[in-house]
Amino acid sequence: MDKSIDFYTKLFELKLVSRREIPQNNAEIAFLRDSEAKGSTLELTFYRNQKKFIQADYEDRVFDHLAFEVKDIEKTIAAMRKEKVTITDEPFKLSATGPMIAFVEDPDGTLIELIQRT
């Protein structure tokens, strides 16, 4: 949990607004909010006994990735390289008139899409 909080607060400038234990679920949650207070909140959940909480109706669900809009994708990628973040796809133009995008992984291997609008 600490690595994930550090990743999102340092590289995406999210602010930790709450962190607490959920004893009945043997879990911990943290809420991170956009530093510009645009209303976006990211909830991180760490289950200490993950297998206990996998339910049949969730097995068919597939989570692909998160996406964050960044002002300068090259600057963001450079900062991530300094922090030894895994860069999955270097910045590239999605189409002739589309945004620049790149993909990285968070400390838990979650795929993160970076988008720089043109």
Name the predicted role of every residue range.
Residues M1-D2, N49-K51, Y58-L111:
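Vicinal oxygen chelate
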Residues M1-G39, K82:
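Core segments of cupin and vicinal oxygen chelate
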Residues L32-A37, V104-P107, R117:
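Active-site beta-strand termini and strand-to-loop segments that position acidic
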Residues T41, L111-L114:
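Short glycine-/small-residue motifs
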Residues L42-T45, F53-A56:
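Unchanged
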Residues F46-N49, R117:
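Acetyl-CoA-dependent GNAT
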